[in-house]
């Protein structure tokens, strides 16, 4: 299971932040915004997974949060990936439920768990509601980091005086 509690660094600033009431078509607009950021960051390898996970979190807001109001944050991870957070004032914590194969809903967090590297739910710092978040890490970014680290360790070092 990918469910982990891991807050971003306190000093991390989101690249994108929106605060508004969600409608039936809000997920489509947020997916488009997310994809634009991922394209600019050269992280398109995580776009499909991140968009699906975002859609599921927004669907939960539309379905379960009174007033459908939430805040959405997008963070670029230094490790080469993206973190998306959806915060709302509803105290009810979503649960991952494996339903009957004929059920029409209830699989959102199962999908989030399947397509993300990490996800979790944590109480909001102000005590009102919760934040549901996920992280998708780029395989390409990880490979590039590994090559850079191996290049650094293989590089000749100047003798110390």
Language-model segments: which ranges?
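Short coil/turn residues that cap or connect secondary-structure elements
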Residues: 22, 38, 42-45, 62, ...
